[in-house]
Amino acid sequence: MPFWRRKKDEFVSLGLNTPAVDEPASQPAPEDLAPVAPPPEEPAPASTPWQTSVLGLDMSIEQLQAREAALEQEFSARFRRAVSATRESLSQRIDSVFAGAKQIDAALLDELEEALIAADIGVPTTMHVLETVRRGISRKEIDDIEKLKASIKSELLSILQGAEAHGVASETSVPESISPYVMMIVGVNGVGKTTTIGKLAQRIKSEGNDVLICAADTFRAAASEQLAIWAERTGVPLIQQKQGTDPAAVLFDSMKAAKARGSDVLIVDTAGRLHNKSNLMAELEKMKRVAGREVEGAPHETLLVVDAVTGQNGLEQARQFLKIAGVTGIVLTKLDGTAKGGIAVAIAKELGLPIRYAGIGEKVDDLVVFDPEQYVNSLFN
């Protein structure tokens, strides 16, 4: 008998303790009637298995290529809209720097420095980019404005790609040898952590994985209730307990349930009280020990949710969580609502952390895998 069915009241939030349905009352046998000739049989239409249709196995190569091209075009348009504020801010500043410029001189580079810093790319990252530009100028590789623009674009892309790392967010399937694949989500309150977990669960589920959510933020009032709304909305089971419960105990129950039901991915919510770093560090360390005892290598990813609107404050949050939580990647939220999207480059350069996902809207599917090339192209085109 499956683990979560052994106790009637245990893991109620999985929604598996449904009442039995009464059998319908027996009816008297109908009276014998004269036989009626059956209608001629019509050939049944050929059915396409659901999995075959979803995976595109019922399509020709040309149809698959057309569908992929349409999806890529849709994603590109949505992403461009999301970073439009950052693009307009950066482009306007850079265009104003280059307007009327006929040659590359110290004054132009100083203005360019101010433009990049204003886009929240950050002082250290801006200095690095300009140093690369100056080397290109000294080598005569950069001798006009267009080559200067191309050099900046290339350097920003190089920074973002250099911080990339593989994980679930790389759109590869979850390794069969790991079950469940544990993703711990951290971040201060108010950055969109709960919303991100809901969207992340929906995305990973839509890729064919069985997902379970662990509501281990038992410190903040109504945290579990808010997560339960997203769990119901996405149809993903949730393990939760009353406020004040030891988060490690909630995680332990969730790990057991995930293994029993054969879940591919377990997404773990955590408390966001960064102001009490010592307690939070001890709590996260305990949770990591619990996860590691149940599944080798768990947690396999620790994603930090950062609000792009906060700009350089988000970079400082990332720096603090990197110390106490062993962050492996970033989810950048509210990218569609800020002109400070340059923070993605600053995080990648100064902390060496990959941007795994980007939140580009309010809808449940508005969480996309962060594509460095798409991001840089959207900023400059």
Protein language model annotation of sequence segments:
Residues 1-158, 178:
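Non-catalytic terminal/linker segments enriched in charged/polar, low-complexity residues
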